[in-house]
């Protein structure tokens, strides 16, 4: 979806050397398929929600490849540039270099922004870069229009009148109560 939102159809992706690999089972990552997919690529952008399960396995699988054939693997963190010692966790504040967030869902717009950023970093023809910029501007305008307004009122939890749980919060004398979830 993110590629289509950026105006990158199958032919354009093929011309740019963009390949997709949808992993069916994330653990363990199938080594032979992974190596076949990675062969000939300069960079791999791993798109996965939450923790870097696939990204770390991919880095480990390709770790011993010669530097001239091993693709740069990115996902949660962006490229730190030449000469940066260590990995992303060697930084004082690794979240300052986030590419795809790990703490929430990844919308097509967020993924599209990451793809566009990486494509522009590795270099694409000027017409495609202009297309990426135009499409991103439209997506950012839509995101701005859909921003959640700041809540001014404080909403306290409560039970609806007539709710059977309302009386269940009162503990009879001599009884003990345990914590539990409620519908409030």
Feature locations, PLM:
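Cofactor-binding active-site loop characterized by glycine-rich and histidine/acidic residues
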Residues: 129-184
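Short helix/loop capping segments that flank catalytic or ligand/cofactor-binding pockets
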Residues: 2-4, 29, 54-56, 167-171
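Terminal amphipathic helices with adjacent charged low-complexity linkers/tails
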Residues: 14, 19-134
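Short helix-loop-beta junction
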Residues: 2-19, 176-177
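Short secondary-structure junctions and interdomain/linker hinges
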Residues: 6, 10, 48, 65, ...
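Glycine-rich anion-binding loop/nest that anchors nucleotide
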Residues: 1, 22, 46-48, 179-182
